[in-house]
UniProtKB/Swiss-Prot annotation:
It comes from the Archaea. Its EC number is 2.5.1.6. InterPro entries: AdoMet_synthase_2_family, AdoMet_synthase_3, S-AdoMet_synthetase_arc. Its cofactor is Mg(2+). Catalyzes the formation of S-adenosylmethionine from methionine and ATP. One of its GO terms (molecular function) is magnesium ion binding. Pathway: Amino-acid biosynthesis; S-adenosyl-L-methionine biosynthesis; S-adenosyl-L-methionine from L-methionine: step 1/1. The lineage of its organism: Archaea, Methanobacteriati, Methanobacteriota, Methanomada group, Methanococci. GO terms for biological process: one-carbon metabolic process; S-adenosylmethionine biosynthetic process. Keywords: ATP-binding, Magnesium, Nucleotide-binding, One-carbon metabolism, Transferase. NCBIfam families: PRK04439.1-3, PRK04439.1-5. ATP binds at residues 141-146. It comes from Methanococcus maripaludis (strain C6 / ATCC BAA-1332). This is S-adenosylmethionine synthase.
Length: 405
């Protein structure tokens, strides 16, 4: 049995606190672009390694930098004059010694990485011309020998932690968290883009709850070729606002809602107009790990890990595995009858099996009529089950079926 500690969460339930702030950076935000590329590169490398070597080899591709380009957006359609520059860096296994054949097998790391980045951009930023609007530069290097040794040690056994680090998760999402998350998903959905094509992918949703009132302040890029006048632009905002308000009704749970879109506009001289749908075209830079946490949100009123999840290897990198695992365990513990809220923290120790954390800390707020003592064994059982089946988490990540930002 792992070192699992269960205790009462000594705080007011989040939905009953007077103030809550929640943020989500959308798919086209420069930081999210970097997160998405980093994870796509990692997933692509996992696939390539398995095809060529039968196993996932050591890599960390969590160092992606975006340098903003320069554009002249205008109603009816503008142009890019300086491309966005994206740097792929990090470490990966580029060659393997085949002792039986007596030769070195070279692996197509850089080609795989660049193709994955460009494929991701094609899906994520619909109006970006990949031939003219962006430059993707790959500078991924060979992995550190000592960390590769920790990664490769006793391959047939449980992977060993690459670092002494921790992961954090919580569940269930609060009303504000749900609305912020679902609002960005709506605005970047295929269905909404088909209906309102002028809505770009660079969207940031900031949610503020004061008592029973939730205010959403949304920054939403518009794509200039679909906007023929300032009146068109205003109409796009009105249509998007109506969609957000209608969608939010499913999650409001008695809360009042106010939606504000592009509050810096004057609707004549200053509007959020872009050529590509992202502010990355206008000098807005981006980096991995500066945006959403592993649950897709930035939640200053909850415990958070500052570590980036996207791009890290899914085999033994604690910054990835334990952050994702913490959220999975929290979600399952929160489903136990009598649990109102749950917070999880998991701490590793470098070189130790990832199934044996130094501590797995569970904090819960019981529902009225339930005692911590009766809930504790059930919560421990959930946590132990996931530690025993941690390879399932890795498989989900390798398959690209886990959201990391």
């Amino acid at each position: 049995m792992a070192n699992i500690v269960v205790k009462r969460l000594e705080r007011t339930p989040i939905d009953e606190t007077p103030v809550e702030i929640v943020e989500r950076k959308g798919m086209g935000h420069p930081d999210s672009i970097c997160d998405g590329i980093a994870e796509s590169v990692s997933v692509a490398l996992c696939k390539m390694y398995k095809e060529k070597m039968g196993v996932v080899l050591h890599h960390n591709t969590d160092q992606v930098e975006l340098v903003g380009g320069y554009a002249y957006p205008e109603v009816g359609g503008g142009c890019m004059v300086s491309p966005i520059y994206i740097l792929l860096s990090g470490r990966a296994t580029m060659e393997v010694l085949d002792k039986e054949a007596g030769k070195v097998i070279k692996l197509p790391v850089n080609t795989t990485a660049v193709n994955a980045a460009r494929d991701y951009l094609k899906k994520a930023i619909r109006n970006m011309d990949l031939e003219k609007d962006v430059v993707v530069d790959c500078r991924i290097g060979q992995g550190s020998v000592d960390l590769v040794e920790v990664f490769d040690r006793k391959r047939s056994e449980i992977p060993h932690a690459n670092d002494t680090s921790f992961g954090v998760g919580h569940a269930p999402l609060s009303t504000t968290e749900k609305i912020v998350l679902e609002t960005e998903k709506l605005l970047n959905s295929d269905a909404l883009k088909a209906e309102i094509p002028a809505v770009g992918e660079d969207i940031k949703v900031m949610g503020l709850r004061e008592g029973k009132k939730i205010t959403l302040t949304i920054a939403m890029a518009a794509v200039d070729k679909y906007v023929n006048s300032c009146a068109d632009y205003v109409k796009v905002k009105e249509l998007a606002k109506a969609k957000v308000e209608e969608n939010a009704k499913k999650y409001l749970d008695g809360h009042e809602l106010e939606v504000c879109i592009n509050t810096a506009d004057d609707d004549e001289d200053c509007i959020f107009l872009t050529v590509t749908g992202t502010s990355a075209e206008m000098g807005d830079d981006g980096s991995v790990g500066r945006g959403n946490r592993a649950n897709g949100l930035i939640t200053p009123f909850r415990p958070m890990s500052m570590e980036a999840t996207s791009g890290k290897n899914p085999i033994n990198h604690i910054g990835k595995i334990y952050n994702i695992l913490s959220n999975i365990i929290a979600e399952d513990v929160a489903k136990i009858e009598g649990v109102r809220e749950c917070q999880i923290r998991i701490l590793s120790q470098i070189g130790k099996p990832i199934t044996e954390p130094k501590i797995l800390d569970i904090e819960m707020i019981p529902e009225n009529g339930f005692e911590l003592e009766e809930l504790s064994p059930k919560a421990k059982e959930v946590a132990q089950k996931w530690l025993d089946n941690i390879s399932e988490v890795t498989e989900r990540i390798v398959s690209g079926n886990v959201t990391t930002f």
